[in-house]
Amino acid sequence: MHKRTFDLLLLVPTAPVFFPLLGGLALLVWAVDGRPVFFSQPRAKKHGATFSILKLRTMTCDDDVEARVPTRLGRWLRHHGLDELPQLLQVWQGHMSLVGPRPLKPDDVERLAQAHPAFRERLQVAPGLTGLAQITQVTGAQRTAEVDAHYARRHSRSMDMRILLRTVWVVLTGFGAR
């Protein structure tokens, strides 16, 4: 079974829960923090192609990037990983997978790959909504590069299921979140 098929087999039956939840959270962001509701930014995907990642907006919209601060809902959304929920649409579209290395900005991939060559291996698989580096709580670019490279070389459906189950646990309990 291909990874894309695996993603869709998990996404389709959960869509009646996740998509109304996404709609409700979008309405909540709009009601509490105003517009825009979503934030998008270019990210690198498989083989270095780019796409625009979509998140619920969690920061103020100040023109000065340095002056931006979390919105009233932003801290809570981020803590529970709910700002990432719009990326389920990008899994649906095939830009992302449920599990894989988290997508980085293209210039960050290039900069980090020069310092840590293992970072290039992450581009051999689709970026994910969650990943091995996230559930193992690694810190530092070198260690993240190693964990992402390990995932790119050895990923399997059983590994993806373990990562997804651990992610659900973190989202529901807040335990183990970084």
Identify the residue ranges that each predicted region occupies.
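A hydrophobic, helix-centered structural microdomain
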Residues: 1-60, 162-178
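C-terminal terminal-structure detector
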Residues: 8, 121-178
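Short, hydrophobic secondary-structure boundary micro-motifs
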Residues: 25, 39-40, 99-101, 107, ...
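Short, glycine-rich, amphipathic interfacial segments at transmembrane boundaries or analogous
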Residues: 36-76, 129-147
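A short, structured surface patch at a secondary-structure boundary
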Residues: 67-126, 164
